[in-house]
């Protein structure tokens, strides 16, 4: 059985962490290596870096950041944002990323998933999906940070993507994102019914109870959050103790 994973998410731009992190022991809150080490020491299981760097020219700073993190942090980490080609993924993996996440580029060109999985293995290929509930009760996949409806139905898209080679799904609920009201349990459960790959739940975490709940009530194997960890509102070690007490498989 897969151990349940707690996964902080860090937004990076120009090789620096943005959306401040309020760790008292950080000398440089914007340094991804410092932030990663602090999370590693706090007991997180994995990390996700979302690169919001706009232009291709600035990619080199991201590659350098990945290299620095890989040298000093010894837990798996995923990098997403701006990955459009097999070559983009290759550069991230060669720099030391364990997995690479693709979102809008996979929607625009689903063959990218198959090409990357064939070259590097499905275990490296993460499908990131932003989804929102529609009036008819279905969920649609959204683009542009949840502002544009792709027209794709969520359950259809995840099945197609896994069939092409995605080895994991990072599933963000745009309805829940930023609300701190808990994860979107019905959506997570619906997706887990149609695919067999690991699912990381994202969007809505506001407390350690929400993390416990998503693991007890859905098949998600990872819980991703940003601000509750960045600002020290939730202790990773305390959450893990609560998970262990609830009988969940967890790395302490």
UniProtKB/Swiss-Prot annotation:
The EC number of this protein is: 4.3.2.10
Q: Does the keyword Amino-acid biosynthesis apply?
A: yes
UniProt pathway: Amino-acid biosynthesis; L-histidine biosynthesis; L-histidine from 5-phospho-alpha-D-ribose 1-diphosphate: step 5/9
Could you name the active-site residues?
Answer: 11, 130
- One GO term of the cellular component aspect? cytoplasm
Superkingdom of source: Bacteria
Q: Where in the cell is it found?
A: Cytoplasm
Q: Which Gene3D superfamilies match?
A: Aldolase class I
Q: In terms of one coarse class, where is the protein primarily found?
A: cytoplasm
Function summary: IGPS catalyzes the conversion of PRFAR and glutamine to IGP, AICAR and glutamate. The HisF subunit catalyzes the cyclization activity that produces IGP and AICAR from PRFAR using the ammonia provided by the HisH subunit.
Assembly with partners or alone: Heterodimer of HisH and HisF.
Name of the protein in its database record: Imidazole glycerol phosphate synthase subunit HisF
Q: Which organism is it from?
A: Streptococcus gordonii (strain Challis / ATCC 35105 / BCRC 15272 / CH1 / DL1 / V288)
Lineage per the UniProt record: Bacteria, Bacillati, Bacillota, Bacilli, Lactobacillales
């Amino acid at each position: 059985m897969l151990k349940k994973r707690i996964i902080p998410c860090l937004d990076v731009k120009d090789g620096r962490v943005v959306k401040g992190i309020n760790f008292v022991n950080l000398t440089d809150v914007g340094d991804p290596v410092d932030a990663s080490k602090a999370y590693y020491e706090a007991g997180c299981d994995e990390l996700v870096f979302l690169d919001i760097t706009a232009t291709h020219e600035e990619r080199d700073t991201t590659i350098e950041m990945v290299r620095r993190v890989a040298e000093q942090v010894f837990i798996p980490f995923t990098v997403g944002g701006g990955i459009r080609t097999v070559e983009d993924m290759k550069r991230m993996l060669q720099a030391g990323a364990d997995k690479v996440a693709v979102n809008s580029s996979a929607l625009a060109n689903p063959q990218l998933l198959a090409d990357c999985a064939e070259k590097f293995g499905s275990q490296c290929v993460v499908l990131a999906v932003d989804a929102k509930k529609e009036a008819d009760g279905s969920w649609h996949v959204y683009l542009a940070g949840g502002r544009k409806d792709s027209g794709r139905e969520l359950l259809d898209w995840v099945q197609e993507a896994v069939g092409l080679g995605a080895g994991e799904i990072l599933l963000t609920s745009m309805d829940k994102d930023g609300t701190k009201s808990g994860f979107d349990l019905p959506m997570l459960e619906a997706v887990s019914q149609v695919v067999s790959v690991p699912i990381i739940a994202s969007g809505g975490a506001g407390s350690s109870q929400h993390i416990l709940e998503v693991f007890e009530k859905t098949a998600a194997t990872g819980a991703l959050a940003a601000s509750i960890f960045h600002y020290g509102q939730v202790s990773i070690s305390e959450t893990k103790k609560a998970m262990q007490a609830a009988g969940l498989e967890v790395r302490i």
